[in-house]
Amino acid sequence: MVAILTPIYEAEFLGFSYGFRPGRSQHDALDALGYGIKGRYIWWILDADIRSFFDTISHSWLIRFVEHRIGDTRIVRLIQKWLKAGVLEEGQRLDTLEGTPQGAVISPLLANIYLHYVYDLWVHAWRKQRATGDLVVVRYADDTIVGFQHRSDAVSFLSDLKERLARFSLTLHPEKTRLLEFGRFAARRRAKRGEGKPETFDFPGFTHICGTKRNGQGFQVRRKTQRKRRMAKLTAVAKELRSRRHQTIHEQGQWLGAVLKGYYAYFAVPTNIGSLRAMRHHIKVRWRMALQRRSQRQRMGWRRMEGLADRYLPQPSILHPWPEQRFLVKHSR
């Protein structure tokens, strides 16, 4: 079913939608955002969080959206059947009029269809009809960032967005949705008002920070690993090390090396080298603690531990280009 529907909707989905689409990744979304903030007049960021999106998708609206594009009633009935299968709550299957089936392969596509009609097309029209300055938007699944040149546009957009979502059984999370000053002049303007450093925002997996280039000249969006993501990975590593306590040092080292390589593959972006080095250090510390708990007779001194780290834990290096470089290559005309 996904193989049938995907080509149909790929021809319909808009360019600023990146989540769960073939040939598009989280880094493509990050590149588009970085390029938009640096290359356009963007002084304000709306970090919009839809409350419990996957659990509150209206089945009736979703079916209407599918019927708008799909004329085959057999496909529509099959989707209705999946939706009526219900969701799991504390081990019990409940019939519901909202939400997408948990774990179903088709769920991400259905979510994209829903947001295409509820959000994407509306944002596209709003930008053309209402925006008085530059506006950039990037959406990855239900995580969306909108950048504005004018604060008045941002305030109007947020008010209109709340009304728009309410029509389709969706709401913004009041505590997680934020409008913040950002961009190349944010630090200077806040300093004049006697305020602190510009606020930061997260998208997806990275904290975005107003910064400068290494030579101190010129604005640069700096990205570092989101603290929540880093701590979750370290917690998972510590837990897995306990289950691997009977493995040899060589086996543990090979596994930890693979973990770090996978971590670097996503997070090794420009401006994030410090966070990567810290991650390697914290994994080394947790490995040492695990080895010491395993062998009470022989202490694992730092000199020996450094030798093991040099052998098994790869040093970080930047693997991804600057966002504007990769974005321009992929979207060159």
Where is each model-derived feature located?
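Non-catalytic terminal/accessory segments
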Residues: 2-333
